[in-house]
Amino acid sequence: MAAMLTAHGHEVAFYRRTTEGVRESSVGKVAGFLSGIYSPSGVRGMREALRRERPDVVNVHNLYPFISPAALFECKKAGVPVVMTVHNFRLICPTGLFMRNGIPCETCLERGNEWSCVRYNCEHSRLKSLGYTLRNVYARWTGAYRKNVDAFACITDFQRQKLIAAGYDAQKIRVIPNFLPIPQSYRSGVGKYVAFCGRISREKGVDLILEVARRNPNIPFKLAGEVRDKELVEQIPANCELVGYLSGDALSQFYQEAAFFVMASKWYEGFPMSILEAACYGKPTIGPAHGGFTEIIGRGDSAIGKLFEPNNLDDLERQIVSLWHAPDEIARLGQMAFEKLQCEYSSEVIYKKWDSLFQELVRKH
């Protein structure tokens, strides 16, 4: 995003803290626990950055663990408007995932239910779950976000609706999706396999994809990504190939030779960029009908892929098998995906949304 703004003539300055080399040590973990709730150095650093840079607008991303939401009060004191890019669900859910035991969980949606993170030990560590909970509780009690953030930029409307349900002011919430560089055109052609690109893990629904492959030995599957769950891939069907983590030309070839992509995530995710990446190559995506997947893939005549009932193996299989045997439909959906990419997710389209928001915030201040 910084490169996009700079390309349009904006000056961009950074204030950031890194956890590199700190979180592995016991001292670092304790420091992260405490500073996530209130970080004196993070507050001081924000104050100094505001004095040094004198910005028109502050765009906040991740404040944890070494800056903390308390730093937002410094922006308020300096009279500088704040827009927060909402990458996940951390404003409501301490873990930021809306997920427990591998499936969606919205127990924390009602204000004050942050303690569910401790109750269910969502971080699989009592101390870590407590730390995550306390940061949310403290931020809510002090009003760090509600009092100091002038606009929340959600990456999906699904996120926006969840913030509203949690009591955030709807007038402060905008939807500005992610974007990526878009090619002028794409090469059409019949694909060779059903593709998945992402972490090889259960929460990504890879176990479901592998089971569909087992049931349909005549359909080839290829999965690209880092293996996070080795048990999951100990016995994979013969028609399924793990190609590992790919980048550069190898990744481009992987996308180009696929018939279509499948994302079977059991949780909502934030903004599933793989859908847009597939669209760059004119490839449709099958995804779960929840979270941001529904609005990105869409329904009806304007859809750029197919939706299946989340965590429903049989429905996922139906969608995969049906689309595999419909090359004309694959081509049509792929064309729709590329056109939607150009109309809604180009850097120019997204820049205009950001520029409009920045100008509005500056005018109001």
Task: For every predicted segment, state its role.
Residues 153, 178, 186-204, 210-216, ...:
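Conserved donor-binding/catalytic core segment of Leloir-type glycosyltransferases
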Residues 77, 90, 102-151:
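Membrane-proximal helix-turn-helix segments that form the acceptor-binding/catalytic region
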Residues 266, 283, 287-297, 310-311:
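Short glycine-rich donor-binding/catalytic loop of glycosyltransferases
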Residues 230-249:
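Nucleotide-activated donor-binding/catalytic signature segment of Leloir-type glycosyltransferases, i.e.
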Residues 299-313, 322-327:
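Conserved acidic donor-binding segment of nucleotide-sugar-dependent glycosyltransferases
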Residues 256-270, 283:
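Acidic donor-binding loop of glycosyltransferase active sites
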Residues 158, 179:
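Carbohydrate-associated surface elements
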Residues 315, 322, 329-344, 350-356:
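A short, well-ordered alpha-helix in the C-terminal region of glycosyltransferases
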